């Protein structure tokens, strides 16, 4: 038995049992309640055969990728590429209705990938990790990602790298097994990520620049803009690009929202919990950040940081 599968069976048996529930893809031609109707186009249902229930309906291009196949493929790849699980922490969640799965493997001290200490503050450590997410109801697209979790900040900053082109829709052309091959380059991926954060941390921003980033990311949403301002852990006049990035990831991590207090023209906000499912919110907001980080607006600051770092080295 491969290492990850044994660990999940031993330490996360309830979630593992959910993940390995037998599922099947069945073609549906008719619906009835109470009258029988024929569908114009057949649909395909992901069916929980153990509990005799349909999880979700899909079109003809959908490929069912059972959670068990994902876990077995990941487990085999970890063993194949020598990624041991000694001194790791696992966060494993499968929705009771089998709608989605999320597994995180975090590498602690004295593990295969010990945390990275930032150069400007050795107490500011970033913990490495791997995350896999998927769903049967199409609410979450399959992803396998390298990740960082910041340990010293109040909100637990996290960041992801998609390990190349492994963010895929479940179409008939998708090969889930091929996605795990990227794990052989995991050490290089982590090294590039930590270098990126050192670059972010090298660039001090003015208050106007911080405001510009929050405004562009918020895309006209006053609630989102004010949430970012409240979760920024540093003074806007004394923040780096790293600090601002930390605030963006707080937005994605904590499923919070800013709600206006008082009259219509009030500028006061309070932070409250969002009503959305936390894991679905997490994944959706992560995608927002990924898109913004790739935008010309953020890339401008990244290139500015590279130039600033180059001048310091010279």
Task: Please report, for each region that a protein language model flagged, where it lies by residue.
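A generic structural signal for beta-strand entry/edge sites
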Residues: 43-44, 52, 100-102, 141
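Generic hydrophobic segment detector
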Residues: 64-65, 78-82, 147-151
């Amino acid at each position: 038995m491969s290492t990850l599968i044994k660990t999940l069976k031993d330490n996360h048996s309830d979630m593992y049992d959910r993940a390995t529930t037998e599922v099947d893809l069945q073609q549906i031609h008719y619906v009835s309640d109470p009258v029988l109707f024929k569908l114009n186009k057949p649909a395909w249902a992901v069916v929980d055969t153990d509990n005799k229930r349909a999880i979700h309906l899909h079109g003809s291009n959908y490929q069912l990728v059972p959670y068990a196949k994902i876990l077995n493929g990941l487990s085999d790849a970890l063993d194949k590429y020598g990624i041991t699980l000694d001194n790791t922490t696992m966060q494993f969640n499968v929705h009771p209705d089998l709608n989605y799965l999320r597994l995180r493997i975090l590498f602690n001290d004295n593990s295969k990938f010990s945390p990275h200490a930032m150069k400007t503050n050795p107490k500011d450590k970033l913990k490495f990790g791997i995350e896999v997410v998927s769903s049967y109801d199409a609410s979450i697209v399959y992803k396998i990602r390298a990740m960082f979790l910041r340990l010293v900040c109040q909100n637990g900053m996290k960041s992801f790298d998609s390990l190349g082109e492994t963010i895929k829709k479940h179409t008939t052309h998708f090969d889930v097994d091929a996605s795990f091959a990227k794990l052989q380059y995991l050490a290089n991926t982590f090294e590039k990520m930590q270098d990126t954060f050192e670059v972010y941390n090298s660039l001090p921003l003015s208050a106007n620049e911080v405001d510009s980033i929050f405004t562009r990311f918020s895309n006209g949403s006053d609630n989102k803009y004010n949430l970012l301002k409240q979760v920024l852990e540093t003074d806007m006049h004394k923040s780096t690009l790293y600090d601002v990035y930390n605030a963006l990831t707080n937005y994605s991590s904590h499923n919070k929202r800013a709600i206006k207090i008082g009259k219509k023209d009030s500028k006061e906000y309070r932070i409250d919990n969002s009503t959305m499912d936390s894991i679905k919110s997490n994944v959706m907001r992560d995608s927002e950040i990924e898109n913004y980080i790739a935008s010309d607006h953020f890339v401008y600051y990244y290139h500015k940081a590279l130039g600033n770092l180059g001048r310091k080295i010279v």
